[in-house]
UniProtKB/Swiss-Prot annotation:
Main location: cytoplasm
Species of provenance: Hydrogenovibrio crunogenus (strain DSM 25203 / XCL-2) (Thiomicrospira crunogena)
Subcellular locations according to the entry: Cytoplasm
Molecular functions (GO terms): ATP binding; metal ion binding; NAD binding; NAD+ kinase activity
Gene name, Swiss-Prot/TrEMBL: nadK
The protein, known as: NAD kinase
UniProt catalytic activity: NAD(+) + ATP = ADP + NADP(+) + H(+)
Family: Belongs to the NAD kinase family.
Pfam families named in the record: NAD_kinase, NAD_kinase_C
Documented EC number(s): 2.7.1.23
GO cellular component annotations of the record: cytoplasm
PANTHER family (UniProt xref): NAD KINASE
Its biological purpose: Involved in the regulation of the intracellular balance of NAD and NADP, and is a key enzyme in the biosynthesis of NADP. Catalyzes specifically the phosphorylation on 2'-hydroxyl of the adenosine moiety of NAD to yield NADP.
Length: 291
């Protein structure tokens, strides 16, 4: 049973305030403690509810259940912060149907009734741990839920780099970049670049090239226990970046080495009891409809 609820909103998004208001009143009626996230709900008028608003690190130490109001981007941001705290997380989608924030405002209250009655499913999802090093010194240490992307910057030129899997040379390529995706991220940027859809329960990572120079360069699926190393060539200096979930960016140079492994912890995603990932795929991708 959950007793301390953390609510996260969309940055500067007053469009989420109506739902946050409903959530606060709902949980207070259920005699639950409600705390808002300072980073995403800084302007929300908490005074009328008599509740706290805490900085994210402090908030994570206080709550046992997280509700994210927004879209998949908002969910990704919170998921990266919550992964070390073993806190279940539920996403309420404000706009279009989401792969991560998959509860609609119309069914939100029914879903929460089920959750508080312990009638729900909880699914563990993997994340990626990213280290960028130069001469043994760590320059960038972050987490990604969907994907880690090596991408050229504004230059029209391709970038060149080598990829290794568990210290074994995989390939050298010229392309616009490389996507390393979790099973969750296989339906994001990776999918639009021609990558496979991977069941979210699999322990795997996919490597998908972005506009490769040679058509023989195909997506590769490797074990989730593998270590991926990206070693850029000289022409990458100042012309390419590593991007986590489309939100965290680090510009790389020729001597930078990027290591990607599975994060040791998991995200615990809360779903309604009748949640069906394949039904969600059909709805998002228009499968089974007449063309």
């Amino acid at each position: 049973m959950f007793n301390k609820i953390g609510i996260f909103g969309k940055y500067s998004g007053i469009q989420s305030w109506d739902l946050i208001d409903k959530l606060i009143l709902y949980f207070q009626k259920k005699k639950k403690t409600v705390i808002l996230d300072q980073r995403s709900c800084a302007d929300f008028p908490i005074e009328r509810y008599g509740i706290e608003r805490l900085e994210r690190d402090a908030l994570m130490k206080e709550i046992d259940f997280a509700v994210v109001v927004g879209g998949d981007g908002t969910f990704l941001d919170v998921a990266r912060c919550i992964v070390d705290y073993n806190i279940p997380i539920l996403g309420v989608n404000l706009g279009r149907l989401g792969f991560l924030a998959d509860v609609s405002p119309d069914t939100m209250m029914v879903t929460l009734d089920e959750v508080l009655a312990d009638d729900y499913t909880c699914e563990e999802r993997t994340l990626l741990h990213v280290l960028i090093k130069k001469d043994g010194e760590t320059l960038f240490d972050e987490v990604a839920f969907n994907d880690v992307v090596l991408h050229k910057n504004d230059s029209p030129r391709m970038i060149e780099f080598e990829t290794f899997v568990d210290n074994r040379f995989l390939n050298s390529q010229r392309s616009d970049g490389l996507i390393i995706a979790t099973p969750t991220g296989s339906t994001a940027y990776s999918l639009s670049a021609g990558g496979p859809i991977v069941d979210p329960g699999l322990n795997a990572m996919t490597l998908v090239s972005i506009n490769p120079h040679t058509m023989s360069n195909r997506p590769v699926v490797v074990s989730g226990d593998s270590e991926i190393l990206i070693r850029p060539h000289d022409n990458c200096s100042g012309t390419a970046s590593i991007i986590c979930d489309g939100q965290l960016t680090f510009q790389i140079e020729a001597k930078h080495e990027t290591y990607v492994t599975r994060h040791p912890n998991f995200i615990k995603m809360v779903h309604p009891k009748n949640h069906d990932h394949y039904e969600l795929l059909r709805a998002k991708l228009n499968w089974g409809q007449k063309l």
